[in-house]
């Protein structure tokens, strides 16, 4: 009996253990079920007291996939317009991480948009450009080749097939061509000498038909001398930042009514003077009312020439004075007489033009000749003749003498002073007297790398105009715009040749300094007209 009872005790214990385990298992299952329900509930309602636990579970479960998440996740796009609502912001495309073709260069500097102002930094290899108006330009207006910049007109340069073509700030590009938007800036605030030559395919050029003007010197009358092509008269000058008006001959004459306009300088200024005479004459119905007061039709000899426009009671004159200063002579110690140039005295011709209403000066062409270039026993100041003086230094001293004379003798309230810059020559293969040529040139230069360096004489002139003179001067900086026009010179077409020998001799002595008429000087006169219009905004001329 006892033994049977003893045998039953373990069964009782096991039975009780089974009960306990069963109850414990049910408790664990209930707890787990409760936690599961709470987990689902907390994900929807953010129950605070279970968050730490769930967060730990999540972190342990996602640990191995976090690096993949970082690679595939797109970076945040910052909306710049929220910070600067008044500034036009370009559309930035933020690439996926790891993209090879759309990453920004490390050298790129994004303009600062703080307070609506930009830092002025340049964005390299991007489409940002400064327009000077507080906005970011469209990429079509930021075309720039070889890091060239255009001064003062907010335009860019684009190099295409070796040519220099100007894309103004308001343009559109269609099929690789440039289409002008006519909403350009005003010429009143524009650098009219910064631009390019454009083909004029209509009837606007030239200003007068070739062969129609009887007052063109034979040396400039390329059409009459047999030049076979006429493309050189079909180019017009287009400033980068604005459009300029054509020279209105009758309007010009109306503004000259009762006045005297005088060109003073060398034969290049005579070239320009003859051009203006022909343009103004062509605008009149009765051309017999225009005449040279002495009846002359050739003007090569140094002197004074005046054309009278009878209906307007005005004259347009030319005074030959290639140096401004006086050509003189000096007796040496041994009795020899030296031809000299008095750098400290004005030419005697000043009495012919000091009363003019508009004066257009130029000098430079004769300073390249052998006598002036060598400068040996030629330049004189006072009683001193310099054994040797560099031509650029002599040129500066002559200009200072001219500037002092203008300041002392010209009434700035009555007279406009204009200085036309140096006209570039195009002799290839040698200088003018040693076989230099420009024959068979039929197009302008388009590749700017072929242009000459800016003339040092013009740098000297600009310094004197800016820092020495008191009288305001309208400076016509035509050096660069003429440098493009290698096609515009008379070359061998300076006369009608009667024999083959004359033709052969002409080839070795070509004129690549002066200009055919009609031709490039017509554009100078258009720019003169526009310059005077600009000056007339402040004072009536």
Swiss-Prot record:
Region annotated Disordered sits at 91-141
Listed Polar residues bias regions: 114-128
Instruction: Tell me the compartments it is located in.
Output: Membrane
Keyword set includes Transmembrane helix: yes
Q: Kindly give any further remark recorded in the entry.
A: Contains 2 motifs that are conserved in esterases, but it is unlikely that this protein belongs to the catalytically active pectin esterases.
**Family statement drawn from the similarity comment of this UniProt entry:** Belongs to the PC-esterase family. TBL subfamily.
Q: What is this protein called?
A: Protein trichome birefringence-like 2
Q: What is the lineage of its organism?
A: Eukaryota, Viridiplantae, Streptophyta, Embryophyta, Tracheophyta
> Which gene does this sequence derive from?
TBL2
